């Protein structure tokens, strides 16, 4: 299996401090969440997508929420700020988890967000289950989709809810692409969109809503590329 650090997006966890410095922040300064949110959302549409999750699965004050593959914990902080839920930001990469914890302290949200540096496949929550679980562009990194989907189901309360944004195979996928996807995207459990839904349903999830975001994300990426090229 390839190392996740081979994926360029994850090569430098501390780069976010350079972005914040460019906004005028010094190393010792407290941070405004809205400024941090410009850089700490490692998924399409930033906090708009996180707000959609809050509304879609009705995240409320005092809910116990787990974010799987939290990166810097951007969505976790936004959820905590907007709802006053208690959020566990679970992240495999130690450097991202440590930087995320520092950002949480600097935004004054440490009472609501707990950063956990652990592999999701090894993670256990013995005392309580979660009311809500969320994840953005992270699950496809984890091997053995059936195993971790079952784990997601078992970590939720009986009336708990799950919100996922993730990658699936596109219509142009060929088996020869697999090695490239593993190396460039650390893709360890990609499957077709329909199979993804089946995997969730087969472990016990009731699928209330789903949407193929391929065309939307393609448009988003093209527009972002144009901005970077200007």
Residue ranges of model-derived segments:
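Conserved alpha-helix/loop element of class I SAM-dependent methyltransferases that forms part
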Residues: 43-61
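A short acidic, Gly/Pro-enriched loop at the edge of an enzyme's catalytic core
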Residues: 123-133
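C-terminal helical/coil "lid" or tail adjacent to the Rossmann-like core of SAM-dependent
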Residues: 211-230
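Class I SAM-dependent methyltransferase SAM/SAH-binding core
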Residues: 66-68, 72-122
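A short glycine-rich, Lys/Arg-flanked "PGG" loop and its adjoining helix->strand segment in the class I
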Residues: 146-161
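Short, glycine-/aromatic-enriched active-site segment of Class I SAM-dependent methyltransferases
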Residues: 167-187
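Short alpha-helix
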Residues: 189-204
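N-terminal auxiliary segments of SAM/dcSAM-dependent transferases
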Residues: 1-22
């Amino acid at each position: 299996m390839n190392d996740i650090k081979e994926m360029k997006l994850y090569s430098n966890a501390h780069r976010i401090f350079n972005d914040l410095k460019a906004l005028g922040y010094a190393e010792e300064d407290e941070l405004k969440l809205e400024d941090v949110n410009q850089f700490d959302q490692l998924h399409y549409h930033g906090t708009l997508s996180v707000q959609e999750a809050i509304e879609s699965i009705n995240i409320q004050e005092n809910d116990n929420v787990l974010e799987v593959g939290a990166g810097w914990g951007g969505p976790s902080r936004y959820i905590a700020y907007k709802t006053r839920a208690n959020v566990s930001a679970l992240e495999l990469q130690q450097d991202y988890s440590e930087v995320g914890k520092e950002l949480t302290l600097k935004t004054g949200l440490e009472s609501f967000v707990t950063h956990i540096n652990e592999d999701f496949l090894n993670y256990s929550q013995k005392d309580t289950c979660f009311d809500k679980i969320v994840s953005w562009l992270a699950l496809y990194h984890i091997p053995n989709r059936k195993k971790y989907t079952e784990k997601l189901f078992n970590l939720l309360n009986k009336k708990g809810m799950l919100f996922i944004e993730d990658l699936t195979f596109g219509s142009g996928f060929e088996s020869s692409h697999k090695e490239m996807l593993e190396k460039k995207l650390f893709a360890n459990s990609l499957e077709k969109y329909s199979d993804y839904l089946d995997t969730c349903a087969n472990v016990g999830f009731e699928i209330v809503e789903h949407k193929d975001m391929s065309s939307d994300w393609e448009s988003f990426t093209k527009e972002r590329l144009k901005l970077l090229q200007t």
